[in-house]
Amino acid sequence: MTSHIKVIYLEDKSAFAASIGNSLTERGFTTEVFNESAEQIEAIDGVVLFHENHNFDRHIAELRDLFDKRQVATHKIDMSGTMNVALSHLSLFFDRIKCKNVLFLGSENLKDNPKLEIFKEKWHL
């Protein structure tokens, strides 16, 4: 269950964030713009990285490294993999970590990935 999640942060002016943001809001999540402020970076206690075959944009890789150094729990979803497995593992991640402030990151090219639609349809947490 994800009732412990207070805020899901999404990057401003990101095609990936725009494509997933409405779906998160419709599911009752509070979303906020991630502006990389020190306050937000301190508050984030979970990161979900969406990718294809472990390919990350430079900016996404830099943010991943920043949160790795801060030892923030991170979960990766490979959009080229099986969505049922990805959704199951995401549920387990949230159940285990109980994070309250989560950052969702994804490369711009993922907005056109057909599996992103499957993810949005089947994510019933």
What are these regions (language model features)?
Residues 2-108, 112-123:
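Acidic/glycine-enriched connector segments
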